[in-house]
């Protein structure tokens, strides 16, 4: 018994930080340093949300397209509306579940980082740690002024809040993810039952609106959903841009000499 005790004491002799801990303690520290939060769950959740967003964007776009087509033929819009409502509802439910999973994962990651900070602080301390030093470290406060030596202190970094730029984004920029979702949805072929009248997928996202009137006259059934939405957005956004530019031109005050009357007699 005495020989084992002497071996244990020799193992933790205070000749340096590497000798302060026993073999079991060093093993625990090594395992704690190797713990990494699983990122696969986060990636899968993001992929699922993006897939549901694609379905919702396609359903909403199809509802808008069928409104024009089926009103001309006197058909009901219940089926496209039901598909859009179902897609949006599924997106909401999955968003709630993903938020809860992200919250729990954040707590887990916070505990792991806190443990690593404490263990890193313990490695730099003596074999015996004072209670007030540990409490001051965990609370982020200065230790009581009864020790001549200033103990290490945890740097409490306040979360920086990035002030968003006050630049107003245009409608086209805001709807860019919506257009990308429809385009990728058409390429992947998912939710084909929603796109009842869509043509062959894979059409380009950015199309000019010059051919929109001719295609409308030829009928909307031959136009795929991606092309239809791109032409609609280009048509309406271009009209809004022209109106704003013309209004700005009217507000300009010309100071040309031709507009001044010569009052000299």
From Swiss-Prot:
Its main location: nucleus. Disulfide bonds: none annotated. The keyword Nucleus applies. GO terms for biological process: cellular response to xenobiotic stimulus; negative regulation of signal transduction by p53 class mediator; regulation of cellular response to stress. It is found in: Nucleus; Cytoplasm. One of its GO terms (cellular component) is nucleus. InterPro entries: HAPR1, HAPSTR1-like. Residues 1-22, 140-173, 194-219 are annotated as: Disordered. The keyword 4Fe-4S does not apply. It comes from the Eukaryota. Residues 147-172 have a biased composition (Low complexity). Keywords: Cytoplasm, Nucleus. It holds the Pfam family TAPR1-like. Acts as a central player within a network of stress response pathways promoting cellular adaptability. Functions as a negative regulator of TP53/P53 in the cellular response to telomere erosion and probably also DNA damage. PANTHER family: CHROMOSOME 16 OPEN READING FRAME 72 (PTHR31624:SF4), UPF0472 PROTEIN C16ORF72 (PTHR31624). Oligomer. Belongs to the HAPSTR1 family. This is HUWE1-associated protein modifying stress responses. It comes from Danio rerio.
């Amino acid at each position: 018994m005495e020989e084992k005790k002497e071996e244990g004491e020799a193992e933790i002799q205070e000749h340096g930080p590497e000798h302060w801990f026993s073999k079991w303690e060093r093993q625990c520290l090594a395992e704690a340093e190797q713990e990494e939060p699983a990122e696969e769950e986060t990636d899968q959740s993001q992929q699922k949300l993006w897939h549901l967003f694609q379905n919702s964007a396609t359903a909403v776009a199809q509802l808008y397209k069928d409104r024009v087509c089926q009103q001309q033929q006197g058909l009901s819009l219940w089926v496209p509306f039901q598909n859009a409502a179902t897609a949006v509802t599924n997106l909401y439910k999955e968003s709630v579940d993903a938020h809860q999973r992200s919250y729990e994962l954040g707590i887990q990651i916070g505990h792991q980082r806190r443990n690593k900070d404490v263990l890193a602080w313990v490695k730099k301390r003596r074999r015996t740690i004072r209670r007030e030093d540990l409490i001051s470290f965990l609370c982020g406060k200065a230790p009581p002024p009864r020790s001549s030596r200033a103990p290490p202190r945890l740097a409490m970094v306040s979360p920086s809040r990035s002030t968003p730029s006050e630049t107003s984004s245009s409608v086209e920029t805001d709807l860019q993810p919506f257009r990308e979702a429809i385009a990728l949805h058409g390429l992947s072929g998912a939710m084909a039952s929603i796109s009842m009248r869509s043509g062959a997928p894979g059409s380009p996202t950015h199309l000019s609106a010059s051919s929109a009137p001719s295609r409308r006259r030829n009928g909307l059934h031959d136009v795929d959903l991606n092309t239809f939405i791109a032409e609609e957005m280009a048509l309406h956004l271009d009209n809004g841009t022209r109106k704003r530019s013309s209004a700005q031109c009217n507000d300009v005050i010309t100071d040309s000499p031709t507009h001044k009357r010569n009052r000299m007699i």
